[in-house]
Amino acid sequence: MNNRVEMRTIDPNIRNKNFEEVSLGYSNEEALLEASRCLNCKAKPCVKGCPVNIDIPGFISKIKENNINEAYNIISKSSLLPAICGRVCPQENQCEKYCVRGVKSLPVAIGRLERYVADNNTCTTKFDIIKNNIKVAVIGSGPAGLSCASELAIMGYDVCVFEGRGCEGICGRI
C-alpha cells in the first residue's frame, strides 16, 4: 500500500528508433492501486500546492470508485488541460510536494493519475459560446497561455495565440 506504482515505459531499444511517448500511462489496475494510496486528508495540503486548485482528493476518490468521467468533471472545473498538465506540470514541486504520504514514503502520483483520467474519460464537454466580436492576443503557447486562450474563447472572445520560440503562432480559431 505504501509503494508508489511506477509508470510503465517503452523499452529503450524500441524508443530510440521512434518519437512515440516514452511513458505508457497507467492501466486501470495500476491507477486503482495508486489511487488507493491517497489518504483523503481533510486539510487537503495537495490542493494548496496546486496552482489551479484542482480538488485532488475528490478526483482520486472517483478513480477509487472507478468513475473516470466524474473524476474528469472534477478536474475540468479547475483545468481545461488535464491531458497536458498530467504530463508536463512539475507536480513534484507543487501538489505532490505537499502530499502527506510523502512524509514517510513517496507521495501519491497525482500527475500520473490526472493523466490517466484525461486519457481514459469518455465524456465530452460542450460549451454554449456567445461570440462578443472582441479580438484578444495571448502571448505564449505553454499551459498557462493555452488555458488562458481556452477560457477567453469560452467567454466568446476571438483568440489568437502567439509563440516566440520558433513557431508562427496558433492563429487559428480557438
Outline where the language-model segments fall.
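Ferredoxin-type iron-sulfur electron-transfer modules and their immediate structural context
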Residues: 1-135
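Functionally constrained cores in energy, signaling, and assembly domains
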Residues: 62-64, 137, 150, 164-168
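Conserved SAM/SAH-binding loop-helix junction
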Residues: 94, 147, 170
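Short acidic, glycine/serine/threonine-rich loops at helix termini
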Residues: 110, 150, 171-174
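N-terminal Rossmann-like FAD-binding beta1-loop-alpha1 element of flavoenzymes
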Residues: 134-160
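Glycine-rich FAD pyrophosphate-binding loop
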Residues: 157-171
